UniProtKB/Swiss-Prot annotation:
It comes from Salmonella heidelberg (strain SL476). This is Histidinol-phosphate aminotransferase. Its EC number is 2.6.1.9. NCBIfam families: hisC (TIGR01141). Pathway: Amino-acid biosynthesis; L-histidine biosynthesis; L-histidine from 5-phospho-alpha-D-ribose 1-diphosphate: step 7/9. Belongs to the class-II pyridoxal-phosphate-dependent aminotransferase family. Histidinol-phosphate aminotransferase subfamily.
Length: 359
């Protein structure tokens, strides 16, 4: 029998896909909890009624109501907005549009969101890392030293999982360093919790700036899978060349348009205020908990904390049905767990469980 007939299906796959370690999403990690504080979701559901029932027809590639509503909300032109299946698809689209596999590289600054790396590896694009400084700000010299051959630089602000904003002057320096050389992607998935820090006002000045947004966090629609890419029209037109022909289903577009109407935006801002209040409650309580070494400042809907024995704490709470996010494997985050801000009842369960931990 020939070797060709004995190859497994896996042998037929691309080598980089065979070697790929997929992104460990909260759902992929599993668990049997009833307090889910590991995915930075809003803790309660928002109800919507479908108004579009014409499901026998394909949807628009870029639903007009969604684009126009988001443009008005974000303070940009409709031509500067692209909607996709979550911001994760936006990450992939930028890499596919701007990076030649085997030639170009992306650059990111760990500890940060894992999908930048996974998306590049899936496509076969080199990944370069310039670890953040001790205060988790950008190592601008390190980035500058690695720009040759880099086509896309990813920066998350506020950063996931650390929760802090990137210094705006450093972002401006980065944009000057990369002008004419690379695209800079600012991931603003959590910007609703600190809207004053958005870079949307910089799009005119920096044609190579791309901003990622989502409805998964403050809009409480993680299950909808709806994200946005904001950029200059030239960039948006390039991304439209590589996006799928029907990225958003009719029900998704229907609900997204409703969420982005004035009433929906006001409701989102109420949720943000509620989350910020609960975040402060949780921070204060964690600082008075014996097994907690340090609580890091956060501008988001989650808190990063360092524990005296994070692995045993994580497992203990897991066994009690309280699911947190272990960050031990991230660079510089040894001993750290990330806790999504939940309801007052959920937050109290976390505190009660932590205070029962042996020290």
């Amino acid at each position: 029998m020939s070797t060709e007939n004995t190859l497994s299906v896996a042998d037929l796959a691309r080598e980089n896909v065979r070697n790929l370690v997929p992104y460990q999403s909260a759902r992929r990690l599993g668990g049997n909890g009833d307090v889910w504080l590991n995915a930075n979701e809003f803790p309660t559901a928002v109800e919507f009624q479908l108004t579009q029932q014409t499901l026998n027809r394909y949807p628009e590639c870029q639903p007009k109501a969604v684009i126009e509503n988001y443009a008005q909300y974000a303070g940009v032109k409709p031509e500067q907005v692209l909607v996709s299946r979550g911001a994760d698809e936006g990450i992939e689209l930028v890499i596919r549009a701007f990076c030649e596999p085997g030639k170009d590289a992306i650059l990111y600054c760990p500890p940060t969101y894992g999908m930048y790396s996974v998306s590049a590896e899936t496509i076969g694009v080199e990944r370069r890392t310039v670890p953040a400084l001790e205060n988790w700000q950008l190592d601008l010299q390190g980035i500058s030293d690695n720009l040759d051959g880099t086509k896309v630089v990813f920066v998350c602000s506020p950063n996931n999982p650390t929760g802090q904003l990137i210094n705006p002057q450093d972002l401006r320096t980065l944009l000057e360093l990369t002008r004419g050389k690379a695209i800079v992607v600012a991931d603003e998935a959590y910007i609703e919790f600190c809207p004053q820090a958005t870079l949307t006002g910089w799009l005119v000045e920096y044609p190579h700036l791309v901003i990622l947004r989502t409805l998964s966090k403050a809009f409480a629609l993680a299950g909808l899978r709806c994200g946005f890419t904001l950029a200059n029209e030239e960039v948006i037109n390039l991304l439209l060349k590589v996006i799928a022909p029907y990225p958003l289903s009719t029900p998704v577009a229907d609900i997204a348009a409703q969420a982005l109407c004035p009433q929906g935006i006001n409701a989102m801002r109420d949720r943000v205020a509620q989350t910020v209040q609960e975040r402060q409650y949780l921070v204060n309580a964690l600082k008075q908990t014996a097994c907690v070494e340090h609580v890091f400042d956060s501008e988001t809907n989650y808190i990063l904390a360092r524990f005296t024995a994070s692995s045993s704490v994580f497992k203990s709470l897991w066994d009690q049905g309280i699911i947190l996010r272990d960050q031990n494997k991230q660079p510089s985050l040894s001993g750290c767990l990330r806790i999504t801000v939940g309801t007052r009842q959920e937050n109290q369960r976390v505190i009660d469980a932590l205070r029962a931990e042996p020290v």
